[in-house]
Each structure stands twice: as C-alpha cells, then as structure tokens.
Amino acid sequence: KEGYLVNHSTGCKYECFKLGDNDYCLRECKQQYGKGAGGYCYAFGCWCNHLYEQAVVWPLPKKTCN
C-alpha cells in the first residue's frame, strides 16, 4: 500500500518542499508506519510506500484539512 502521510488530528497531509528524495518525509513515514516504510516528497506532500494494508493514509473519512 502507499499514500500521503496524514496528520490524524488535522486531516492534513504532511507538507514538503524538496521534491523527490526527502529525508524529512522518509523519517516521518518510518516513524508513523514502521521501519519497512519508504517515503519521498511528491506534489509537495510526503508520500509513503511499502506500507501494511491497514495503514491509514490521506484523505481521512469525515476529516477535512482546515
């Protein structure tokens, strides 16, 4: 599974500005989804890959980013 890293309290994607390989996104994806996860910056949001199937990614149901 893959998808955008989401802040569960706000419903917003984690923003990033250095597209492609991005240490911040990689670190945040691993912290939220485990050491097997990967991550990079895609379209100014942290995109995580190699996730377990039940991983929660953006968008959250009934939670819009404010």
From Swiss-Prot:
SS bond list: C12-C65, C16-C41, C25-C46, C29-C48
Keywords: Disulfide bond, Ion channel impairing toxin, Neurotoxin, Secreted, Toxin, Voltage-gated sodium channel impairing toxin
GO cellular component: extracellular region
UniProt-listed InterPro entries: LCN-type_CS_alpha_beta_dom (IPR044062), Scorpion_toxin-like (IPR003614), Scorpion_toxin-like_sf (IPR036574), Scorpion_toxinL (IPR018218), Scorpion_toxinL/defensin (IPR002061)
Domain of life: Eukaryota
Domain LCN-type CS-alpha/beta: 1-66
Main location: secreted
Xref: PROSITE patterns: LCN_CSAB (PS51863)
Record localization: Secreted
GO MF annotation terms: sodium channel inhibitor activity; toxin activity
One Pfam family of this chain: Toxin_3
Tissue: Expressed by the venom gland.
GO biological process, one term: defense response
Family that this chain belongs to: Belongs to the long (4 C-C) scorpion toxin superfamily. Sodium channel inhibitor family. Beta subfamily.
Primary role: Beta toxin that binds site-4 of sodium channels (Nav), reduces peak current (observed on Nav1.6/SCN8A (IC(50)=172 nM), Nav1.1/SCN1A, Nav1.4/SCN4A (weak) and Nav1.5/SCN5A (weak)), shifts the voltage of activation toward more negative potentials (observed on Nav1.6 and Nav1.2 (weak)), and induces resurgent currents at negative voltages following brief and strong depolarizations (observed on Nav1.6, Nav1.1 (weak), Nav1.2 (weak), and Nav1.4 (weak)).
Further remark: Negative results: does not show inhibition of peak current of Nav1.2, Nav1.3 and Nav1.7 (at 460 nM).
Domain notes: Has the structural arrangement of an alpha-helix connected to antiparallel beta-sheets by disulfide bonds (CS-alpha/beta).
Protein name as catalogued: Beta-toxin Cll2
Organism from which the protein derives: Centruroides limpidus (Mexican scorpion)
Top-level taxonomy: Eukaryota, Metazoa, Ecdysozoa, Arthropoda, Chelicerata
